[in-house]
């Protein structure tokens, strides 16, 4: 039996479910991905959580909590500014948001002691799991922001930090793809921890038990439900390992109905701009999906011409790398018919 080819992640599957062309453009063509301030702020927050999750840095953590300011430790301040400058989010507004969200995450049971002392606490627990046993066939890959393992209770607490401006909506609240993916990964990595639960912390919100809390706790997923998820993964794996340009035309976001559950899905994902650079009434650019319009880009390639990584700007390509200039024609659903 052949091995699964593509690594499945929650974000990859969600992209496929959201829009078949977006999946094709990002994962098959391999166009460069446009970052944004929100994602870049999140990258920095996650970095600080990983750094301060090390037991040997507990004194640094304690000082920050005592002062209620992540900049009370100069090395942390320098680290934040270093990466904020690199990612283009070093203006005052972005820095304040980074400070606030980082402190919020540090203040909330950062070492997982509310359920007792964990036998193991891991920051950025990665997983790369291949199953090909005749019944199931899939390859899942990703990482868990924080994982706490409580040996006596045989309990695994899975924690994910979110820096988005909204909490989950619609089915994501109770039937969450990340929750299933992480729970399955922990079952494979630590099978002796039979009780597993996920919590998502939205750092722009208060992390308390109020009505508008940024804490979303998921009900534990049963082994039967995880087995059902494995059947789904097997079907998705087969589909994506044979994904073609014809499949890319099968489920355009623009052809889907508008969402009724307040989720960011369907045509909303395309954006309402009718041409590149269209401005809103206030003079700011209208948002549009990064796959919507045509553009040129650059791809580094290996000796066989296989694409390694893509870039918007030629100046960003590492020195000495072989590369090609390529053209992306834009999303067919938004191209003007001649």
Residue positions per predicted region:
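RecB-family 4Fe-4S metal-dependent nuclease core
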Residues: 1-338
């Amino acid at each position: 039996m052949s091995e699964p080819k593509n690594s499945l992640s929650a974000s990859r599957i969600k992209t496929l479910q959201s829009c078949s062309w977006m999946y094709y453009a990002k994962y098959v063509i391999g166009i460069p991905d446009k970052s944004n301030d929100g994602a870049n702020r999140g990258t920095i927050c996650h970095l600080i959580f990983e750094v301060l999750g090390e037991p040997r840095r507990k004194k640094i953590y304690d000082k920050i909590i005592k002062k209620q300011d992540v900049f009370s430790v100069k090395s942390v301040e320098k680290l934040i500014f270093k990466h904020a400058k690199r990612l283009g989010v070093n203006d005052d507004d972005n820095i304040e948001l980074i400070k606030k969200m980082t402190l919020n995450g540090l203040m909330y049971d950062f070492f997982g002691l509310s359920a007792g002392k964990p036998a193991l606490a891991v920051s950025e627990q990665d997983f790369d799991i291949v199953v090909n046993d005749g019944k199931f066939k899939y390859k899942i890959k990703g990482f868990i922001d924080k994982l706490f393992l409580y040996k006596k209770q045989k309990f695994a607490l899975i924690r994910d930090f979110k820096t988005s401006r909204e909490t989950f909506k619609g089915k994501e609240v109770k039937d969450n793809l990340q929750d299933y993916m992480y729970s399955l990964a922990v079952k494979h990595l630590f099978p002796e921890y039979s009780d597993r639960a996920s919590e998502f912390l939205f750092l722009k919100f208060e992390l308390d038990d109020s009505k508008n809390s940024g804490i979303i706790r998921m009900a534990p997923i049963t082994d039967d439900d995880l087995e059902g998820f494995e059947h789904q993964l097997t079907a998705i794996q087969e589909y994506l390992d044979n994904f073609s340009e014809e499949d890319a035309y099968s489920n355009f976001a623009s052809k889907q109905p508008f969402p009724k559950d307040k989720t960011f899905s369907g045509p909303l994902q395309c954006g309402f701009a009718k041409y590149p650079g269209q401005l809103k009434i206030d003079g700011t650019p209208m948002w549009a999906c990064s796959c919507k319009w045509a553009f040129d880009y650059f791809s580094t390639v290996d000796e066989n011409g296989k694409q390694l990584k893509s870039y918007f700007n030629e100046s960003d390509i590492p020195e000495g790398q072989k590369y090609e200039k390529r053209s992306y024609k834009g999303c067919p659903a938004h191209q003007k018919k001649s």
